[in-house]
Amino acid sequence: MQFKRAWKQVDGVLLLDKPLGMTSNDALQKARRLFSAAKGGHTGTLDPLATGLLPLCFGEATKFSADLLDADKTYEAVLKLGVTTDSGDAEGQVTSTAMVDIQKEQVSEVLPRFVGDIQQIPPMHSALKRNGRPLYELARQGIEVEREPRAVTIFAIDCLDFSGDLLTLRVACSKGTYIRVLAADIGKALGCGAHLAALRRIVVGDIRLGNSVTLAELETLDEAGRMERLLPVDALLQSLPIVGVEGPEAERFRHGNPVSLPAGLAGKARVYAEGRLIGVGEPGHGGLLWPKRLVQLAD
């Protein structure tokens, strides 16, 4: 007799340290099964070759996952100098090799060129679509199409280590930044070429890797232990001010109706009733606080 899993409402945020070689969706589904969570989603894809912070949203937390998609990110990246690949990372075919005779002073001179607002041409080996087809499918057929440059922002690049032909960087950047494109561009500027050999995401928005858990660690815990690793839904909303509502106003907000706007509130706020999150509101028509997203947390 086949066992049928009993899915349940689980509301919260899991800070997962994604392992090497696993897709973001596979990591999500494995974590979801461990929690028996009826609904789940992740907050921005990490390639299989990348590790690190992958916030997972369960239940009502999925309503806020898009906010992290738009958040700034920080990565630790290892560049292999002297070797370029067609994909820009270690999975691709080698397209060129060169001797590496680079001094740290040259690295220090080149890196600042990439800080600020820059233009990146998305790689062919990416999930961007052309006429409904992902670019990586075209790339696998040997087809290359023209791609429009995209504006991204690099807030900071720090050299963490430089040894031989390996250059380790910490990169703080805006959403949509392709670190393997940055790696290739830095290699080109150094005159030797480069590809992305390893990538680890360490910050998403205000959330840091240090509070994360691995799938292997989750598998050793019982149900109570796993639930202790789950952050509340409002862990994604810590940058928003708090508004408290009571009685009839709380009921109005829960049913999608506006409530009184607190003095001085100019943007979105997280709204609580009796100490429980009931949604996010923002100022709107009539000088009132209008519901933007509502949540119904399980007891």
Curated annotation (Swiss-Prot):
InterPro entries: PsdUridine_synth_cat_dom_sf, PsdUridine_synth_N, PUA-like_sf, PUA_sf, tRNA_psdUridine_synth_TruB, tRNA_sdUridine_synth_fam1_C, TruB_C. It comes from the Bacteria. Keywords: Isomerase, tRNA processing. It is an enzyme of class 5 (isomerase). Pfam families: TruB-C_2 (PF09157), TruB_C_2 (PF16198), TruB_N (PF01509). One of its GO terms (molecular function) is RNA binding. It catalyses: uridine(55) in tRNA = pseudouridine(55) in tRNA. Its EC number is 5.4.99.25. GO terms for biological process: mRNA pseudouridine synthesis; tRNA pseudouridine synthesis. The active site is at residue 47. Responsible for synthesis of pseudouridine from uracil-55 in the psi GC loop of transfer RNAs. Belongs to the pseudouridine synthase TruB family. Type 1 subfamily. This is tRNA pseudouridine synthase B. The lineage of its organism: Bacteria, Pseudomonadati, Pseudomonadota, Betaproteobacteria, Rhodocyclales. The gene is truB.
